[in-house]
UniProtKB/Swiss-Prot annotation:
Annotated organism of origin: Mus musculus (Mouse)
Modified residues annotated as N6-acetyllysine in this record: K21, K175
Sites bearing Omega-N-methylarginine, chain numbering: R282, R284, R291, R310, R315, R320, R325, R331, R340
Cellular localization per UniProt: Nucleus; Cytoplasm; Membrane
Gene3D superfamilies recorded: K Homology domain, type 1 (3.30.1370.10)
Region (Interaction with HNRNPA1): 351-443
Residues with Phosphotyrosine modification: Y387, Y435, Y440, Y443
Cystine residue pairs: none
Annotated positions of the Phosphothreonine modification: T33, T71, T84, T183
Tissue: In adult cerebellum expressed in most neuronal cell populations, specifically in cerebellar granule cells of the internal granular layer, ROR(alpha)-positive Purkinje cells, internal granular layer and molecular layer interneurons (at protein level).
Protein name as it appears in the record: KH domain-containing, RNA-binding, signal transduction-associated protein 1
Function: Recruited and tyrosine phosphorylated by several receptor systems, for example the T-cell, leptin and insulin receptors. Once phosphorylated, functions as an adapter protein in signal transduction cascades by binding to SH2 and SH3 domain-containing proteins. Role in G2-M progression in the cell cycle. Represses CBP-dependent transcriptional activation apparently by competing with other nuclear factors for binding to CBP. Also acts as a putative regulator of mRNA stability and/or translation rates and mediates mRNA nuclear export.
Gene giving rise to this polypeptide: Khdrbs1
Cross-link annotation Glycyl lysine isopeptide (Lys-Gly) (interchain with G-Cter in SUMO2), location: K96, K102, K139, K175, K432
Amino acid sequence: MQRRDDPASRLTRSSGRSCSKDPSGAHPSVRLTPSRPSPLPHRPRGGGGGPRGGARASPATQPPPLLPPSTPGPDATVVGSAPTPLLPPSATAAVKMEPENKYLPELMAEKDSLDPSFTHAMQLLSVEIEKIQKGESKKDDEENYLDLFSHKNMKLKERVLIPVKQYPKFNFVGKILGPQGNTIKRLQEETGAKISVLGKGSMRDKAKEEELRKGGDPKYAHLNMDLHVFIEVFGPPCEAYALMAHAMEEVKKFLVPDMMDDICQEQFLELSYLNGVPEPSRGRGVSVRGRGAAPPPPPVPRGRGVGPPRGALVRGTPVRGSITRGATVTRGVPPPPTVRGAPTPRARTAGIQRIPLPPTPAPETYEDYGYDDTYAEQSYEGYEGYYSQSQGESEYYDYGHGELQDSYEAYGQDDWNGTRPSLKAPPARPVKGAYREHPYGRY
């Protein structure tokens, strides 16, 4: 009976029932840990005899149960480190724009505080401020792809350096521009690109160039650069790059320091033509002809090597011009080695006076032959006598006449062997005149 009425044991039982039967406690996960030993059997020993021992065994003093890491607790935002909240895209863009928004005021403040004597720094700051205001830095980052199938035109710019440091004495600017700028105009028409010479030394007036350089005008900012050729091309991507390549290849020809190439020679001829000088072909011809000794005033207006008309002197045979066929001097002197080879008589008009040259002894065979004398003396007489005797005879029309054959044979033997005592023509020679009436009389 004493154990039933013991207040300590009664309090212990009541506390054990409340922990096991209360389903809506502060820690509902106590049910998930059944392997945890209950502290009820140990409490009577440590706190027996008074109500304080029962108060220590209250559930408020128990440690909190362990939770799995994936299960958030009701106070997750308070206990532990809080996660970074997600920002909307507009807020992210604003965060990215903050450096640029700060960069622009800094540049403007630095430009205002900078001394105006620093012209280059002022120009660089102005260019950078303009890029940020226009947003060109963003465009350069975004436009990294080319659409080859679109018909959208693009603009290409290239600067080709002129080697003035390697060749300081050569006038590259004059070679590229040409007389009155005609060369660079033709180059632009051929390549389809806009070509200009820019940089230090591109202007003829050095004082004006220095003044414009110090003026700080953005239009003349190129005067602070090295001397170069600026090429601009506008068109579709494929066509633009092709035009740029062609233009650079043509400009490369003008960067060769050679004054005797075809480009410079054409420019010299064009310059002489613009200045009113006669045609270059005539000037060249005069200089070439003046190398030899000029003859005394020739009657023929033609130049060297072209003598009088094509009769007696051009071929070097004066016999054809005015000498009769019976002249033995020309027959005895072989003309080709003495007259035809020499260039001097070809340019002289008075070649007939050179006929009485010292004759050399000719061979006897040529002197005995003398068929020219027979033609001049007895050719017509033989023809007349033959016509008077043979007009009435019809036997001369026979093709196989014996007298005709004998006459031809006698002529050939006596003529070439030189055995004829007289210098008369053979009788068969005049037969040609009679046979002209018949078409077959020659055979």
